[in-house]
């Protein structure tokens, strides 16, 4: 038995929960540390980079799920660890004005938990999707699950932004507690009972060690080339993650709630960008994965250039440009995810989890690297330049990286041909 559309939707709810919790740490808490607490942007940048760096263990989670099974347990366990880490991170933000050293130690511990939680839950979930979804449904399954994740991010950011104003430590802790507890409960209900009904491959007599499994996947030319592309493009994608909200607060005067809402609107743009590609490919038969990846990269570059220009125009409206950035980010992301899901099922069988783990690690390392470099560069240049110029230089570098990623995509995705998202037929 393979996954049906209802089961795919249920697993997508887990992605929704992951996005809802993670956005608290990369958006709300990041903004509070930089603007309200006046801490250097490199501090939350380093913490977020730590949680991404720990996800280098994703290949190990993937290989374990390939050889041992019981992915459901690790999906739920990972979500519980992620939720605990996010709540402790919020507690640390509240403690910073009172006990800086203790708050920093608690923050480090919290983001370690976040990193392990996302790695365990996310990799096990994606491996379950890739291995139990029919090939003709994989790209559509990717679209559904990532749309739900972005929906969770956008709704959480918008809702939290609404209830966070006026800001108070007590209000922050209540909001984070509700979101994290709700995520654990919904994840458990969503994933429970799905895996036991699926067809299970016969386990290997001598399961490979991690390095052996990685060597097998790395020997596949397509998997290797896609890993390099994913690292470069995700570095571009995440370079602004930790500085866009501080930029809105410092240059445009946005409040804490307004910047959190801005993040929600950006992710709303991502949602509609993903939806556009899904409808264009599956319904209207317009374009290919390669074409949409390139479109997303180039459109993101143009939106970033607009954000740079607006910083030097008094009274300029930032929101439309940020929504545009989200829209083209969504176009890029869903096309790249479709290619990734398709490639996960190619090559040697019973290595879907290892491939997803390898690409998840590449994405996580790129996200941590991009976020930390972006925050550090902005901090450094703000010492010598006006805020608008300092942030603008980072956004400009991100725009250039997206152009390079578009050029690379023409080779990497073209090597697979013009793969299309399968049509979702009513009643399936």
From Swiss-Prot:
GO terms for cellular component: membrane. Its main location: membrane. Pathway: Porphyrin-containing compound metabolism; bacteriochlorophyll biosynthesis (light-independent). It is a multi-pass membrane protein. PROSITE patterns: MFS. GO terms for biological process: light-independent bacteriochlorophyll biosynthetic process; photosynthesis. Pfam families: PUCC (PF03209). InterPro entries: MFS_dom, MFS_trans_sf, PucC, PucC-rel. It is found in: Membrane. One of its GO terms (molecular function) is transmembrane transporter activity. The chain crosses the membrane at residues 3-23, 32-52, 73-93, 115-135, 144-164, 172-192, 225-245, 269-289, 291-311, 317-337, 358-378, 393-413. Keywords: Bacteriochlorophyll biosynthesis, Chlorophyll biosynthesis, Membrane, Photosynthesis, Transmembrane, Transmembrane helix. PANTHER family: 44.5 KD BACTERIOCHLOROPHYLL SYNTHASE SUBUNIT. Belongs to the PucC family. This is Bacteriochlorophyll synthase 44.5 kDa chain. It comes from Rhodobacter capsulatus (strain ATCC BAA-309 / NBRC 16581 / SB1003).
């Amino acid at each position: 038995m393979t996954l049906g559309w209802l089961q795919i939707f249920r697993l997508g709810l887990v992605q929704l929960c992951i996005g809802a919790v993670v956005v608290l740490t990369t958006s709300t808490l990041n903004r509070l540390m930089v603007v309200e607490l006046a801490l250097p942007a490199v501090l939350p940048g380093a913490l977020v980079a730590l949680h991404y760096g720990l996800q280098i263990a994703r290949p190990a989670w993937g290989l374990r799920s390939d050889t041992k099974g019981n992915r459901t347990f690790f999906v739920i366990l990972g979500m519980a660890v992620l939720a605990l880490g996010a709540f402790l991170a919020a507690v640390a933000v509240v403690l910073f004005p009172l006990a800086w050293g203790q708050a920093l130690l608690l923050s480090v511990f919290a983001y370690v938990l976040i990193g392990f939680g996302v790695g365990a839950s996310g990799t096990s979930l994606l491996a379950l999707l890739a291995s139990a979804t029919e090939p003709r449904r994989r790209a559509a399954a990717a679209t559904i699950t990532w749309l739900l994740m972005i929906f969770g991010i956008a709704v959480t950011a918008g809702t939290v932004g609404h209830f966070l104003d006026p800001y108070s430590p007590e209000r922050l802790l209540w909001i984070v507690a509700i979101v994290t507890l709700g995520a654990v409960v919904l994840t458990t209900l969503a994933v429970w009972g799905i895996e036991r009904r699926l067809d299970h491959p016969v386990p290997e007599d001598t399961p490979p060690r991690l390095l052996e499994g990685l060597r097998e996947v790395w020997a596949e030319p397509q998997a290797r080339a896609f890993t390099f592309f994913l690292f470069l493009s995700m570095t571009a994608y995440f370079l602004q993650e930790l500085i866009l909200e501080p930029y809105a607060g410092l240059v445009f005067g946005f409040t804490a709630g307004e910047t959190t809402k801005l993040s929600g609107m950006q992710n709303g743009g991502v949602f509609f960008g993903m939806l556009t590609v899904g409808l264009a490919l599956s319904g209207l038969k317009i374009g290919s994965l390669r074409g949409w990846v390139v479109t997303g990269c180039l459109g993101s570059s143009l939106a970033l250039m607009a954000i740079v220009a607006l910083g030097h125009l008094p009274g300029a409206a930032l929101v439309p440009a940020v929504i545009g950035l989200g829209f083209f980010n969504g176009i890029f992301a869903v096309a790249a995810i479709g290619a990734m899901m398709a490639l996960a099922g190619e090559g040697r069988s019973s290595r879907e989890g290892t491939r997803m783990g390898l690409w998840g690690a590449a994405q996580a390392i790129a996200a941590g690297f991009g976020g930390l470099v972006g925050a550090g560069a902005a901090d450094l240049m703000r010492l010598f330049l006006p805020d608008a110029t300092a942030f603008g230089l980072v956004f400009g570098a991100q725009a250039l990286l997206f152009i390079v990623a578009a050029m690379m995509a023409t080779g990497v995705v073209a090597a697979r041909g013009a793969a299309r998202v399968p049509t979702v037929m009513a009643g399936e």
